[in-house]
């Protein structure tokens, strides 16, 4: 027992470096400090000023469905051709992207999607308790809203939404489907372009991610 405790003490004196001062880097650093490690974060910018700056600030333990999935493949051509699409490429860079694109397509198979979603869910299911543990040590007055998060869609994207809903149901994710009337009751100022929706009542969002 004494040898084991000595080993733990030695491990806790180790110095750990973390690259990136976004929300993930900072949270990892804080948990390591709580375990007794000496931690240094490396980033050429101020904490929270790169990927974590200007994001939606969602606390989303339900977000276990990966981007790599079968239904995405059929949407790629229209994404590339649309000037307003979410996917844009520099055509002179396509050749360099081929290895990445091949890996992306290979991981769009259903068995790969299920494998990724399973382990993402196991990790994300622990996220809210982990955040709560850290937040006990800081003043969060007015910085976090506990109002849930709602998604809406049209019939045009119903097939993809059904895939997401069914996958989350299989993983045991808590979700509540909404009719157009229920969406209107929750958000009467939202233009009624939608045909359905889902709400995650336990989800949260940050009013100012950088300040947190």
Question: Positions of the model-derived regions?
Answer:
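Short beta-strand/turn micro-motifs composed of small residues
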Residues: 20, 43, 153-154
